[in-house]
Amino acid sequence: MEEARIATSHDSIPHVKPVSFVFAEDSIIIATDYDTRTFSNIKLNSKAGIVIDIYKSGEHKAVCIQGETKIIEEGKEFKKWYDIFYKKFTWVRKDPWTEKEAPFLKIIPKNKVSWGLT
């Protein structure tokens, strides 16, 4: 399963949730909705953390990333990420959206740590 967990916050209160993601151009891209806690937190505080991991007993592999988040709502970059998500995820094909209906969040890594990866 390709899922990660994103952490955002405001007023020093953390919020963590599972998300689908794409890793491209040295960034992590996720889709969200305007009415989510994640989006409202990012509007107030652009810093985010994300964990991507695979867990098998004795073979845990993970990367933890902290970075700055850019909101992508329209234009060529929106279209590029939407096309990638559309091809990759069934849930996007079942419930499509257009520009300004739901944004993408682009997490640009500033710090990272990993284990179990070569």
Question: At which residue positions do the language-model features occur?
Answer:
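Short, surface-exposed beta-strand-loop junctions and turns on beta-sheet-rich folds
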Residues: 36-38, 57
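Short beta-strand segments in beta-sandwich/barrel cores
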Residues: 4, 28, 48-50, 69-70, ...
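Short secondary-structure boundary/capping segments
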Residues: 20, 40, 94-97
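Structured helix-beta-strand junction loops
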Residues: 1-2, 45, 88, 110
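Short beta-strand segments
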Residues: 1-34, 42, 50-53, 64
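Short acidic (Asp/Glu) patches
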Residues: 34-35, 47-52, 83-93
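A short beta-turn/loop motif at secondary-structure boundaries
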Residues: 12-13, 56-58, 98-99
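Charged, gly/pro-rich active-site loop segments
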Residues: 61-118
